[in-house]
Amino acid sequence: MIQGIQITKAANDDLLNSIWLLDSEKNEARCVAALKGFEADQVVSINDLGQFESREVAIEAAPRIEGGQHLNVNVLKRETLEDAVAHPEKYPQLTIRVSGYAVRFNSLTAEQQRDVIARTFTESL
């Protein structure tokens, strides 16, 4: 478990008022901020800090930004979309998924229609 502390009293003056993250499982201390003697992100053994008194400092985990994939599933044939480009009057209700939204294929511009056709169909994975 990781605990945030501010050192309030220590034999080593460089530790006074410094802020650390203590990892009790690894027996490590990571310097968050110190006026002198330690660099930010420097990792030392908790034992290397010597005797000290501290107060707990609340820490908040940064949100994880995870990448991801977005998948739109359109179940139809390439020929159907190509025919809809050539004969839009035959497909007034043709609806596809684009960026998670349902849209009428005929409401897209010609460039958007070509892009959908190019991205929707692949020869292999």
From Swiss-Prot:
Signal sequence range: none
Chain ranges of the Glycine radical domain: 5-125
Keywords: Organic radical
Domain of life: Bacteria
Calcium is among the record's keywords: no
PTM annotation (Glycine radical): residues: G100
UniProt GO cellular component terms: cytosol
GO molecular function: formate C-acetyltransferase activity
Function description: Acts as a radical domain for damaged PFL and possibly other radical proteins.
Name listed for the protein in its UniProt record: Autonomous glycyl radical cofactor
Organism: Vibrio cholerae serotype O1 (strain ATCC 39541 / Classical Ogawa 395 / O395)
Gene from which this protein is expressed: grcA
